[in-house]
């Protein structure tokens, strides 16, 4: 069994992740904490570590037949291709994703996230493929991506050439 929709959550900026202070005060953030295994106490680093341990526990069955594509989440980028932290609700870095997946390669497969408006989008696409990404993940309305934007056609072409499918939310 492979559950393609498993989100990596993280709070600590020490692992390249980010949670916007406004988002930390939102109802969505409260609900994420309520309905996930994200611990409610401890430092951000301790909570991140405990969350990953909880994920491992979910997949650690006697038959070792479960796997998951673990998903990163890129940020919002401005018109010059720079990360806009003010508009980014949260960011789960590809580097952190690969770090977590490398500890359990039999059960966790990396689903990277690359916003096509990044200045280095094509380079990042190549990099994550080389590191073992099995797909690219977007949430267009949260990442400021217009999937019909003709400016991102080269990104789609390169994704196709690399054999990377796109997993995306419609709302």
Show which residues each predicted segment covers.
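Helix-coil boundary/capping segments in enzymes
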Residues: 1-171
